[in-house]
C-alpha cells in the first residue's frame, strides 16, 4: 500500500534534495515500519519516507492500559489520528499492545527508583526497552522490516553497520538526550526523517498535506501520567511518608509530603517562605536525607549547597559499545534541554565513571542521566549515581 495518493508538499520540495532514479529504485527494495504515535512528527516522517521511495507501513503501539480516568491517556484519540494519517497517505497501519512489556521493563523500574529516593527518566527507558527493542524486534521479525523509523529529532550518519547518533538539526527540539542508550547497531536499523529539519517545517509539510495532525499539540509528560497531577498519580502506587524540612544548618522550617515528590533544585511547591529571622531569598531543594526522611533546603539560587563539581555515573551505554578507558574531554547534559557543560570523563572501571565539570553545576540529580557529546555526535551516557561536591 505504498504511497497510493498523489499528495505533494511544496515545503518538502524546498527542504529535501530530489533523489536520483537509482536511489529511489534502491530505496524501493527496503521496507520501513514507522512508529505512528498520532502526532505530527511521526505523520510527516511517514510521508518523507514515501517521497524517498521506501515501502512504508505504520505501527501504532499501545503501551499503557487506561485506568478508569481515560481523559488522561489519549490512546484511543491518538490511534484515530494515526489511522486517519495512514488512510490519507495510503499506507497500512498495524497495531500492537506492548503494555505488559512497558509495565515490566519501564514502569516497575520507575516506581522502584522513586521509592529509593531518586528521580528517574522513564522516557529514556521507554526508548531503550519499547521503541528500540520490542518495536524494533517485532518490526523486523514479524513484519519483515529492513528499518524502523520514528519522529525523533535526531540524525544518523554513517552506514548501517557503523552508524553514529547526532543531535537533531533543530537544537530546540533535539532528542538525542533520550536516545543515548541505543547501540550503533540499533541506530543503523533506524531512520529519523525529521531530524534534518526544524519543527516549523514539519508542521508546514503537514499543513501542505492537509493532515489531521498538522496543528495537534505536542505531547508533554508521560502517557501514563498525562495531564493529571504527578503527586496524585504517584500516591496511588507508593505510600507517602511525610517528614521534616530542614535548612542546611539543621533548622526545621516546615513539613514535606514525601521525599519522592521532590527533586533537587526544585523551588516551587515547597510550602515555605517568609520565615521570621530569614531574608526573602527563595528556598531550593539541596538534598534528600533518606535515612531520616528529611528534605534539606538551601536559600538562594547560588547557594554553594546546591552546587556540584562533578558526578559519578553507572549503568553506562556508549553508542559504539566501546567502554571509555582513558580520560576524555567532552561536554555533558545532566538534564534535557540543558546547555552543554564542558567536562572531563575519568573512567573508574568499565561500569563506572567520574565526571568533573569545568564549572560547578546546580541540581545534579541522582537517577537522571548524564549524556555526553563531542560536537554534534552523541557518545552515550549513564545514570547519575551521586554528586561530587
From Swiss-Prot:
It is found in: Cytoplasm. Residues 121-123 are annotated as: Interaction with target base in tRNA. It is an enzyme of class 2 (transferase). The active site is at residues 126, 223. Gene3D superfamilies: Adenine nucleotide alpha hydrolases-like domains, HUPs, Translation factors. It comes from the Bacteria. GO terms for cellular component: cytoplasm. ATP binds at residues 35-42, 61, 151. It catalyses: S-sulfanyl-L-cysteinyl-[protein] + uridine(34) in tRNA + AH2 + ATP = 2-thiouridine(34) in tRNA + L-cysteinyl-[protein] + A + AMP + diphosphate + H(+). One of its GO terms (molecular function) is ATP binding. Catalyzes the 2-thiolation of uridine at the wobble position (U34) of tRNA, leading to the formation of s(2)U34. Transmembrane segments: none annotated. It comes from Mannheimia succiniciproducens (strain KCTC 0769BP / MBEL55E). Belongs to the MnmA/TRMU family. Its EC number is 2.8.1.13. Disulfide bonds join 126-223. Coiled coil: none annotated. Keywords: ATP-binding, Cytoplasm, Disulfide bond, Nucleotide-binding, RNA-binding, Transferase, tRNA processing, tRNA-binding. This is tRNA-specific 2-thiouridylase MnmA. The record marks 152, 368 as: Interaction with tRNA. Residues 173-175, 335-336 are annotated as: Interaction with tRNA. Its main location: cytoplasm. One of its GO terms (biological process) is tRNA wobble position uridine thiolation. PANTHER family: MITOCHONDRIAL TRNA-SPECIFIC 2-THIOURIDYLASE 1, TRNA 5-METHYLAMINOMETHYL-2-THIOURIDYLATE -METHYLTRANSFERASE. It holds the Pfam family tRNA_Me_trans_M.
